[in-house]
């Protein structure tokens, strides 16, 4: 199964609480943090919620 490399590129300071919670669920705490997750529907939904704050790459 493919994996997603998710990098936080923008601050969460002025974002809504549910978007902050989504970043925390992904394991991202500050700008520059990187996490690798399985490519599942749940993780895709998380990424879609905070797409303006993160950069996503598919890795094998």
UniProtKB/Swiss-Prot annotation:
<keyword id="KW-0687">Ribonucleoprotein</keyword>
<dbReference type="Pfam" id="PF00327">
    <property type="entry name" value="Ribosomal_L30"/>
</dbReference>
<comment type="similarity">
    <text>Belongs to the universal ribosomal protein uL30 family.</text>
</comment>
<dbReference type="InterPro" id="IPR005996">
    <property type="entry name" value="Ribosomal_uL30_bac-type"/>
</dbReference>
<dbReference type="GO" id="GO:0003735">
    <property type="term" value="F:structural constituent of ribosome"/>
</dbReference>
<dbReference type="InterPro" id="IPR016082">
    <property type="entry name" value="Ribosomal_uL30_ferredoxin-like"/>
</dbReference>
<protein>
    <recommendedName>
        <fullName>Large ribosomal subunit protein uL30</fullName>
    </recommendedName>
</protein>
<dbReference type="GO" id="GO:0015934">
    <property type="term" value="C:large ribosomal subunit"/>
</dbReference>
<comment type="subunit">
    <text>Part of the 50S ribosomal subunit.</text>
</comment>
<dbReference type="InterPro" id="IPR036919">
    <property type="entry name" value="Ribo_uL30_ferredoxin-like_sf"/>
</dbReference>
<keyword id="KW-0689">Ribosomal protein</keyword>
<dbReference type="GO" id="GO:0006412">
    <property type="term" value="P:translation"/>
</dbReference>
């Amino acid at each position: 199964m493919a994996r997603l490399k998710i990098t936080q590129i923008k601050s969460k300071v002025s974002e809504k609480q549910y978007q902050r919670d989504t970043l925390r669920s992904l394991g991202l705490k500050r700008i520059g943090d990187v996490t690798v997750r399985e490519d599942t529907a749940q993780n895709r939904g998380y990424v879609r919620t905070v797409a303006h704050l993160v950069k996503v790459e598919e890795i094998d």
